[in-house]
Amino acid sequence: MAKKVVTNIKLQVPAGQANPSPPIGPALGQHGVNIMEFCKAFNARTQGQEGMIIPVVITVYADRSFTFITKTPPAAVLLKKTAQIAKGSNEPNRTKVAKVTRAQVEEIAKLKMPDLNARDLDAAVLTIMGTARSMGIEVE
């Protein structure tokens, strides 16, 4: 028989840096989950991706056990890393803060493909280009 799901918790946690402090501790603690067990498992799973923000979906069951799924980093984080900028433009349509090539956008789209609802790579590239445009990053 399948376990009864109590809730799904969605968080964005820096890879390899999960610890019991907020926001992780309170989010898991209110559902009775062993926080340190999650932190150790998450840090082990995201070991090679230091410096990236990793979205995670934690499924909590009635017996206080849990499973979690890590997703790919947000497109905005990948674009900022590729363009080597700290943040996007305050006025995206007026001032451009960086340039990325279409090949770089295609690499990001390939990485993000499992989490995007795009049918093919071209649609995924257009999605990433839209994110870049809204951040003030020009695609060449």
Curated annotation (Swiss-Prot):
One of its GO terms (biological process) is translation. This is Large ribosomal subunit protein uL11. Disulfide bonds: none annotated. Part of the ribosomal stalk of the 50S ribosomal subunit. Interacts with L10 and the large rRNA to form the base of the stalk. L10 forms an elongated spine to which L12 dimers bind in a sequential fashion forming a multimeric L10(L12)X complex. One or more lysine residues are methylated. Forms part of the ribosomal stalk which helps the ribosome interact with GTP-bound translation factors. Keywords: Methylation, Ribonucleoprotein, Ribosomal protein, RNA-binding, rRNA-binding. GO terms for cellular component: cytosolic large ribosomal subunit. Belongs to the universal ribosomal protein uL11 family. One of its GO terms (molecular function) is large ribosomal subunit rRNA binding. It comes from the Bacteria. SMART domains: RL11. InterPro entries: Ribosomal_uL11, Ribosomal_uL11_bac-typ, Ribosomal_uL11_C, Ribosomal_uL11_C_sf, Ribosomal_uL11_N, Ribosomal_uL11_N_sf. The gene is rplK. PANTHER family: 60S RIBOSOMAL PROTEIN L12, LARGE RIBOSOMAL SUBUNIT PROTEIN UL11M.
